[in-house]
Regions:
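N-terminal small/glycine-rich loop or linker at the start of catalytic domains
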Residues: 2-26
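Active-site mouth loops of central-metabolism enzymes
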Residues: 18-33, 88-92, 146-148, 232-233
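Conserved, mostly hydrophobic/aromatic
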Residues: 34, 52, 110, 182, ...
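Glycine-rich, proline-tolerant flexible connector loops at the mouths of alpha/beta enzymes
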Residues: 48-68, 201, 263-265
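Alpha-helix-loop-beta-strand connector modules within alpha/beta enzyme cores
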Residues: 61-85, 220-226, 280
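Active-site beta->alpha loop and helix N-cap motifs at the rims of alpha/beta catalytic domains
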Residues: 68-72, 76-147
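Catalytic alpha/beta core domains of metabolic enzymes, predominantly
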Residues: 113-246, 250-257
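Conserved small/polar residues in nucleotide/adenosyl-binding loops
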Residues: 298-303
Length: 308
């Protein structure tokens, strides 16, 4: 009997809070644009949709539940993809602001950043110099002196809210220490397996994007958690597809989307997150890997609710 092929979960992060509207005309900003981008990504093979929101007037990241209200119902009506609402929001926001949409909408999945860190976006000023909105340049400049605050108390608070809402978490780990922070909460029985770890590579302030960095993260997670977790990786910027390919070959799930990279190939802007999902899906299928559906994702990782 032939062995069933491994199913790979594709997460798509369609807008995020890192890039700004002046960097790409394809970055979705309004609720309808974000919802439409998510629906197209799901149709291309993404089983998880990681969602941020933006002010529809100037594109600035926002955690206003009223803006999310214009995004979530449309996606749920058109797809069966798993909704993953950010609790990271933007490093410029308070933890209380960041938690609001997940608290209100009680999604089946939410992201949770597993440690405080420097969050350097200012190198993008070397590539982009003209901005339509004042906040865009300010956000990048201020990241020279910015700590993305995720203390143990912050993490515990978000975990408790998630538990009360039957929300599970995608644990975003930007460095090796974040895996140890996760282990701390597992040892305190505040997190139960199986859990979903998103390893983030190539963001200034976190772990690098060298193949050895990827393997170090994998070896450490295996040692700490054994078979109790699903591993996913994302590479920031130019590292997106290279790391997705390397990770998939090592047993990882993958994440793509315009939150993580504006590009589809060197020097060419991606016209949609769907394009990136399609590209990574083609890579995975060349490896003879199956693409997970939302149903198979649920089977692989966690029970799901139907709150949003």
């Amino acid at each position: 009997m032939s062995k069933e092929k491994r199913k790979v979960i594709i997460t798509c992060a369609v807008t995020g809070a890192i890039h700004t509207p002046s960097m790409s005309k394809y970055l979705p900003v309004s609720p309808d644009e974000i919802a439409d981008a998510a629906i197209l990504a799901a149709g291309a093979g993404a089983s998880i949709l990681h969602l941020h929101a933006r002010d529809p007037i100037n594109g600035k990241p926002t955690q206003d539940p009223a803006v999310f209200e214009g995004i979530l119902p449309k996606i749920k009506k058109e797809t069966d993809a798993v909704i993953n609402i950010t609790t990271g929001g933007s490093p410029h926001m308070t933890v209380e602001e960041r938690m609001m949409p997940a608290s209100v909408f009680k999604p089946e999945l939410a992201s949770l950043n597993m440690g405080s860190m420097n969050f350097g976006l200012y190198p993008m000023l070397d590539r982009f110099s003209e901005f339509e909105h004042t906040w865009e340049r300010d956000n990048l400049e201020k990241s020279r002196d910015l700590v993305f605050k995720n203390t143990f108390q912050d993490i515990e608070t978000i975990l408790k809210i998630g538990k009360s809402n039957e929300t599970r978490f995608e644990f975003e780990c930007y460095d090796i220490s974040h895996l140890y922070n996760l282990k701390h909460f597992v040892d305190r029985n505040l997190i139960s397996p199986p859990f979903f770890i998103q390893s983030v590579f190539g963001l200034l302030g976190g772990i690098g994007a060298h193949p050895e960095d990827l393997m170090h993260m994998k070896r450490t997670a295996d040692r700490l958690f054994g078979s109790d977790y699903q591993w996913s990786i994302l590479g920031a910027g130019k590292n997106q597809m290279t790391l997705a390919s390397m990770g998939a070959a090592q047993g990882a799930n993958v994440r793509v989307g315009l939150e993580d990279s504006l590009w589809i190939e060197p020097g060419k802007l991606a016209q949609s997150s769907k394009d990136q999902v399609t590209k990574v899906r083609n890579i995975l299928e060349e490896f003879s890997l199956d693409i997970a559906t939302p149903v198979s994702y649920t089977h692989l990782t966690l029970p799901t609710t139907k709150n949003v």
